[in-house]
């Protein structure tokens, strides 16, 4: 054997693979950077969606904890509002029955029909009033959500009336 057998010579095949693997690595790094940026942007969006974290610096763990608390709070609030809606529907049905009992048939003398008080408000006005009330109470209720255990007086009255 000669001394030339121990020398490794770079072939054209080896040199052509090196740039490909560098390109592949660079492409992978770019994709990974894009993925990390997307996760970072998503956490920023989540942070900005939680009222108690808006504009604050917070770790990802804090963002997830506060977001979880806020979601639970909103679910409780949504459930309470749904109960209020159901109570109001029941009260509305009772009032409609009382109106039917007190006015069994429309006047036949050609006089205009009496309007139900509930029909006087347009649905858009009712929604606007509900939205204004809920948005003004949202921030104050969210900050004191842990102490929110007592049922509102209006619902207590409705529940007692329905019994």
From Swiss-Prot:
GO terms for cellular component: MLL1 complex; nucleus; RNA polymerase II transcription regulator complex. One of its GO terms (biological process) is positive regulation of transcription by RNA polymerase II. Residues 134-146 have a biased composition (Low complexity). Residues 1-13 have a biased composition (Acidic residues). Residues 23-74 form the bHLH domain. Signal peptide: none annotated. Pfam families: HLH. All four alternatively spliced forms are present during development and in all adult tissues examined. Residues 29-40 have a biased composition (Basic and acidic residues). Residues 1-40, 98-117, 128-163 are annotated as: Disordered. One of its GO terms (molecular function) is protein dimerization activity. InterPro entries: bHLH_dom, HLH_DNA-bd_sf. CDD domains: bHLHzip_Max. Its main location: nucleus. Keywords: Activator, DNA-binding, Nucleus, Phosphoprotein, Repressor, Transcription, Transcription regulation. Phosphorylated. It is found in: Nucleus. The keyword Glycosyltransferase does not apply. Efficient DNA binding requires dimerization with another bHLH protein. MYC/MAX heterodimers bind to target DNA with high affinity. MAX may also form homodimers which recognize the same target sequence, but which are unable to function as transcription activators. Component of some MLL1/MLL complex. Belongs to the MAX family. Transcription regulator. Forms a sequence-specific DNA-binding protein complex with MYC or MAD which recognizes the core sequence 5'-CAC[GA]TG-3'. The MYC-MAX complex is a transcriptional activator, whereas the MAD-MAX complex is a repressor. This is Protein max. It comes from Xenopus laevis. The gene is max.
């Amino acid at each position: 054997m000669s001394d030339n057998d121990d020398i490794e010579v770079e072939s054209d095949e080896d040199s052509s693979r090196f740039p490909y693997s560098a390109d592949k690595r660079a492409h992978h790094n770019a994709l990974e950077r894009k993925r990390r940026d997307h996760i970072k942007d998503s956490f920023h969006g989540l942070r900005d969606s939680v009222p108690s974290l808006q504009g604050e610096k917070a770790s990802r763990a804090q963002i997830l904890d506060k977001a979880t608390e806020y979601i639970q709070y909103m679910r409780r609030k949504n459930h309470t509002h749904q109960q209020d809606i159901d109570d109001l529907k029941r009260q509305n049905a009772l009032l409609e029955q009382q109106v039917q009992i007190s006015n069994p048939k429309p006047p036949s003398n050609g006089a205009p029909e009496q309007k139900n008080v509930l029909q006087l408000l347009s649905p858009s006005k009712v929604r606007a009033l509900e939205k204004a009330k809920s948005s003004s109470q949202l921030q104050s209720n969210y900050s004191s959500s842990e102490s929110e255990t007592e049922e509102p007086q209006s619902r207590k009255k409705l529940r007692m009336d329905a019994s």
